[in-house]
Amino acid sequence: MMAKAKALIPDNGRAGADEGNRQAWIGQEVLRREDRRLLTGTATFAGDLGVPGQLHMRIVRSTQAHARIVSIDATEAEKTPGVRMVITSEHTRHLGSVLLEELGYHEIYENIEDFSHPVLAVDKVLYVGQPVVAVLAVDPYLAEDAAELVSIEYEPLPVLLDPEEALTGKVELFPGRGNEGARIKKAYGDIDRAFAEAEHVIRHKYVTNRHSGVPMEPRAVVVQPDPARDTLFIWGTVHVHDNRRIIAKMLNLPEVNVRMKHVEIGGSFGVKGGVFPENVVAAWAARTLGVPIKWTEDRVEHMTSTSHAREMVHKLELALDAEGRILGMKDEIFHNHGAYFRQAEPLVSDITAGIVFGPYRVPAYDATLHAVFTNKTPVGAYRAPGRYESTFARERIFDLACAEIGLSKTEFRRRNLLTAEDLPWTPGLDIVHEPYHFDSGDVVKHFNEALEAANFSEWLEESKRLRADGRKVGVGLGVLMDKAGLGLFETGGVEVSRAGRVTVKTGGSSVGQGIETVLAQIVAEELQIAPENIDIVHSDTELIPDGVGSWSSRSTVLAGGAARKAALAVVEKARRLASEMLEADPDDLELTAGSFKVKGTDQQISLYEIAAARDPFTARADNDEPGLAADAVYMNNAMNYPYGVTLVQIELDPDTGGHRILRFSTSTEAGRVINPLTTRGQIIGAAVQGIGGALYEEFLYEEDGQPITTSFMDYLLPSAQEMPNVDCFVTEDAKSPDNPFGAKGLGEIGIIAAGAAIASAIDDAIADGVHTDRLPVTPEQIFSRCQGLNKAER
């Protein structure tokens, strides 16, 4: 059944209501403005672009997981008609590897550049799919044919795939530097005392296997040079300001000579973020040859070369008192980064180590994370990176604890979740150099309300009745906590034109989350105009000199905060000008329907009329700036930590190992909802991906490092047919005090606890004493357990 949502977002008297004479746009279900161009096929993607005279780039990728490059023979490829150049590391060696220090990661990881990704492989390859050679030709088919003529001789080396084995030293991927890029320690409290005084100590190992976002649209980039000005125009990247900064430095260009331009990039989910080596090769080639370069990856390339995610091992230990209250938690984590560090991923290891304890009262905590390298595709961020994996481990060991000490899953959570009296919770560790600060809320209260809203007790009773009738039906849950708003600033600008339009510029980017719609609502409320009169400009470094971008559920709070700040500055300037033009006291002016009105009179002037009156000559005569515009930088004091619970009821088919999710509910404390429609959409989309990671998706490898899952024939994705109805229960009881909206990030909520809740429900359905400790759960595993082929084990 197609995923849909039950409307369980409270109105609170705001949505669509007027506050006095002011129109409240925040809280309304405004339709996404992005959807029309996407649904009608009028949106422009990088793959749609065609620049006269462009060459097409094809990458020759490694066929070996670990090998020395003995020789490269491109003679036949270079002879092919239509081929303009064959690029190897001899051309790009001087560029080095994709820079990481430019993003500040060296503050977390010492010597991080030792492990960054080469532009093209130099002397050796570390994974199947690594770029080795680039072929440029006049059309993509010639480029592909010529690429197949490139002959590369390899000397195979021992292959390393297991993250725990990476620390044994049997195989070194980086000779003299080992396979551990970093070791991260996070701790607070007296962990030794906690375990010494514990009545119950529970230990278990949990594994989340490798999968990723696999968006419909693969990566693509177009680079157009302007040789006269030594300038590059680049389309097709997510984080435009990071790409500009890094590509400019690698090519030894001033940043102003690299101009990132907006184009639709489709779904990202984190996996398209950062700077990829192919982008650098395309930029270098365009500048070197003075002609446009276009590159689009195919699906096999995407599955083997675009960032993977999720592969972690958690060796978790839990200390409890006699009543089942948590005394302490220890975790040793092995994070499989694949062959190199990529842009986003160094942050994920740090976040993971600092967030395993979740929204619980944990007096003592000690986590050590090993960021290790293997001969697999490098990993990157994927929706709720670090949170999905750590939540699975934590919630699963809590279920194990419930079985050992005789508590229900719900009662154990109630005894240990944070309450209003516990907050703010600042235990004394940092996440990415920011002190962990759980600012507001009441997790226990929300937990109880979410269970009641879903009628969870009925789920439990129904499942018992159905099991008594011989059906394999079970119920599971997982409590979640997200970390949102990473990256402490964002830029924005608002300009009112005389033509009756408002332009909002933002350093954020559109990756499918509806940022254009939400920013229009935020600015509309401050200017008191309709959102449809507002245009949003983003992802263009010529128009927006600086910015951070959209990731880590930060757009509403940070991009929205910057847009609101700029809008307020416009309102204040307009109020001053209106008071002069209407000869009225500023305090007697009220802004409604886009116009300043003098209270008690019919005198008024619109924002557009004020903008028109501030032409350069008039403004100069008044010693004022022309126009009606303002730019702003919004600085956030801290990240925010939304929380919630995911509930699942599942039925298993013992004869096939198949499964059907009967009910799925996810809740969150939102602080404040800007647009209920986009909120539900984000929760549903994330839930679908969480179900995929729990039951369907996995990148598999042969023992020699050859990838098995290289197409959608092998890599399973849930379709609409497999999706349950998704109920969303969203409360607005705990506004975050650290941002002007009181909002918390919501883009990743639906995915975080999906794996944990589904695993919990599967164990409940089978009730064989076996503890699910690995994702995804396959039909083969379910069949085996239902047929009694597994012995109970922990």
From Swiss-Prot:
Domain of life: Bacteria
GO process terms (BP): nicotine catabolic process
SUPFAM superfamilies, sorted: CO dehydrogenase molybdoprotein N-domain-like (SSF54665), Molybdenum cofactor-binding domain (SSF56003)
SMART domains listed in its UniProt record: Ald_Xan_dh_C
Keywords tagged on the record: Metal-binding, Molybdenum, Oxidoreductase, Plasmid
Pathway: Alkaloid degradation; nicotine degradation
GO molecular function: 6-hydroxypseudooxynicotine dehydrogenase activity; iron ion binding
Catalyzed reactions: 6-hydroxypseudooxynicotine + A + H2O = 2,6-dihydroxypseudooxynicotine + AH2
Note accompanying the cofactor annotation: Binds 1 Mo-molybdopterin cytosine dinucleotide (Mo-MCD) per subunit.
EC number: 1.5.99.14
A Pfam match: MoCoBD_1
Xref: InterPro entries: Ald_Oxase/Xan_DH_a/b (IPR000674), Ald_Oxase/Xan_DH_a/b_sf (IPR036856), Ald_Oxase/xanthine_DH-like (IPR016208), AldOxase/xan_DH_MoCoBD1 (IPR008274), AldOxase/xan_DH_MoCoBD2 (IPR046867), AldOxase/xan_DH_Mopterin-bd_sf (IPR037165)
Cofactor or coenzyme needed: Mo-molybdopterin cytosine dinucleotide
Task of the protein: Molybdo-flavoprotein enzyme complex involved in nicotine degradation. The subunit gamma (large subunit) contains the substrate-binding sites, the subunit alpha (medium subunit) binds FAD and the subunit beta (small subunit) has a 2Fe-2S ferredoxin-type domain which binds 2 2Fe-2S clusters.
Record note on quaternary structure: Heterohexamer of 2 alpha (kdhA), 2 beta (kdhB) and 2 gamma (kdhC) subunit. Dimer of heterotrimers.
Entry protein name: 6-hydroxypseudooxynicotine dehydrogenase complex subunit gamma
Source taxonomy: Bacteria, Bacillati, Actinomycetota, Actinomycetes, Micrococcales
